[in-house]
């Protein structure tokens, strides 16, 4: 049984929607908070969490009337407690407090904590059997099989926040699941869409951080430039929608207007369109199964001069080849790919390896660990974190070799 609903018509729960935002001070969390503000009277905020931005967390908690606020860094506890003194808001710190926030009585949880730290809280939220708006990639990339099984077993509803997966989710409502042929994820192509292999190999940090369409953090902007973001999205779609690897295609769409397409047996292709603005999929998830007013710019089709598509080049962008190989290998290979990529991106941003070295380090780590039999799929958050740790250590050990080959 899939935890992602196949139809859009389930009734809205009666009364106000009780909301928890895990990762409230990040871009996704802030956008969610803004939508909650706009819908005053329809939402009540139960809990908010942050990594270490105590000032912003305290401000949001007071403004939104949260009942509980938690910070990941335990050393920030005293600061948060002081910032919320006299407010009546309960305060916590550390991993256990993040899990407590996820377990609080909310019927809609935004899981937007970044990185592996968001895995256990998201698992906890799914275990409550309510709606989880999933923005944390690690849940699906590192522990997709375990997470979706856990969500389904507890009758949780998982709504994809990522723009491409949200587009697929919306488009799937146009037909029956058994009539689905394939899905198509779109990619902007990033800053190096038309660059040569040599230009890509030697790209600078500054060049890689110039995304043509989206305003994002440094890590995801580099992932867009390498197309590892699309590789990770393939893994996410594989688990979210219970697809076979050959049912997931990618098209480069430079305008970033069409976010995802679904093809059915009668050869109808249904697509979701919108301005490149993450507030649209967030609003869709917050209002689901209904629609709420969103703040994104209205799409003016008359002003669009063209919508173009290109097949991606797996030679210039080996991430797309590596993710296919990881899915074929199965087990923990996707977890290894994600961890190695994080080490590689951090090393590139620190100017320790060239841009082309990112994919080479990921491939070398996959070869080292999958060959050693580290291929059992994680069955829990702890197992996923253990594989993640091993892969990071392996990637770090291989780093000097990758750097040496580039010199």
UniProtKB/Swiss-Prot annotation:
GO biological process, one term: isopentenyl diphosphate biosynthetic process, methylerythritol 4-phosphate pathway involved in terpenoid biosynthetic process
Names of required cofactors: Mg(2+); Mn(2+)
Family: Belongs to the DXR family.
Protein name: 1-deoxy-D-xylulose 5-phosphate reductoisomerase
Residue numbers binding 1-deoxy-D-xylulose 5-phosphate: 137, 163-164, 188, 211, 224, 229-230, 233
Catalytic activity: 2-C-methyl-D-erythritol 4-phosphate + NADP(+) = 1-deoxy-D-xylulose 5-phosphate + NADPH + H(+)
Residues engaged in binding Mn(2+): 162, 164, 233
InterPro entries (alphabetical): DXP_reductoisomerase, DXP_reductoisomerase_C, DXP_reductoisomerase_N, DXPR_C, DXPR_C_sf, NAD(P)-bd_dom_sf
Organism for this UniProt entry: Afipia carboxidovorans (strain ATCC 49405 / DSM 1227 / KCTC 32145 / OM5)
Listed HAMAP family: DXP_reductoisom
Pathway noted in the entry: Isoprenoid biosynthesis; isopentenyl diphosphate biosynthesis via DXP pathway; isopentenyl diphosphate from 1-deoxy-D-xylulose 5-phosphate: step 1/6
GO molecular function, one term: 1-deoxy-D-xylulose-5-phosphate reductoisomerase activity
Role played: Catalyzes the NADPH-dependent rearrangement and reduction of 1-deoxy-D-xylulose-5-phosphate (DXP) to 2-C-methyl-D-erythritol 4-phosphate (MEP).
Pfam families tied to this protein: DXP_redisom_C, DXP_reductoisom, DXPR_C
Gene3D superfamilies referenced in this protein's UniProt entry, alphabetically: 1.10.1740.10, NAD(P)-binding Rossmann-like Domain
Keywords carried by this UniProt record: Isoprene biosynthesis, Manganese, Metal-binding, NADP, Oxidoreductase
EC number assigned by the record: 1.1.1.267
Lineage: Bacteria, Pseudomonadati, Pseudomonadota, Alphaproteobacteria, Hyphomicrobiales
Binding-site positions, NADPH: 25-28, 53, 136, 138, 217
């Amino acid at each position: 049984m899939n935890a992602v609903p196949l139809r859009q018509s389930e009734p809205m729960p009666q009364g106000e929607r009780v909301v928890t935002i895990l990762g409230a001070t990040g871009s996704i969390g802030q956008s969610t908070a803004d939508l909650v503000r706009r819908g005053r009277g329809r939402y009540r905020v139960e809990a908010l969490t942050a990594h270490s931005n105590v000032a912003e967390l305290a401000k949001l908690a007071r403004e939104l009337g949260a009942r509980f606020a938690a910070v990941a860094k335990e050393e920030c506890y005293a600061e948060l407690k002081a910032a919320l003194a006299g407010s009546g808001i309960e305060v916590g710190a550390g991993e256990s407090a993040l899990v407590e926030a996820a377990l609080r009585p909310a019927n809609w949880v935004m899981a937007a904590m970044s990185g592996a730290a968001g895995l256990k809280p998201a698992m906890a939220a799914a275990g409550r059997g309510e709606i989880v708006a999933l923005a944390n990639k690690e849940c699906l990339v590192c522990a997709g099989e375990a997470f979706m099984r856990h969500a389904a077993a507890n009758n949780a509803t998982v709504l994809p926040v990522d723009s491409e997966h949200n587009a697929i989710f919306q488009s799937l409502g146009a037909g029956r699941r058994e009539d689905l042929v394939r899905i198509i994820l779109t990619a902007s192509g990033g800053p190096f869409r038309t660059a040569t292999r040599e230009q890509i190999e030697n790209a600078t940090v500054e060049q890689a951080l110039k995304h043509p369409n989206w305003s994002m953090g440094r890590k995801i902007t580099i992932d867009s430039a390498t197309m590892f973001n699309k590789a990770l999205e393939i893994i996410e779609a594989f688990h979210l929608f219970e697809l076979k690897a050959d049912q997931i295609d990618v098209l480069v769409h430079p305008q970033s207007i069409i976010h995802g397409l679904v093809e059915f047996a009668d050869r109808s292709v249904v697509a979701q369109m919108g301005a490149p603005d993450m507030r649209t999929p967030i609003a869709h998830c917050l209002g689901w199964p209904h629609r709420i007013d969103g703040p994104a710019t209205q799409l003016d089709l008359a002003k669009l001069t063209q919508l173009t598509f290109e097949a991606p080049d797996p030679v210039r962008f080996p991430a797309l080849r590596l993710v296919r190989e990881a899915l074929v290998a199965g087990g923990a290979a996707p977890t290894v790919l994600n961890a190695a990529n994080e080490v590689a991106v951090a090393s590139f941003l620190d100017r320790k390896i060239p841009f082309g070295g990112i994919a080479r380090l990921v491939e070398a780590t996959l070869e080292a660990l999958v060959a050693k039999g580290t291929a059992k799929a994680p069955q829990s958050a702890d197992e996923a974190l253990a594989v993640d740790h091993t892969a990071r250590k392996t990637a770090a050990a291989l780093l000097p070799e990758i750097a040496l080959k580039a010199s």
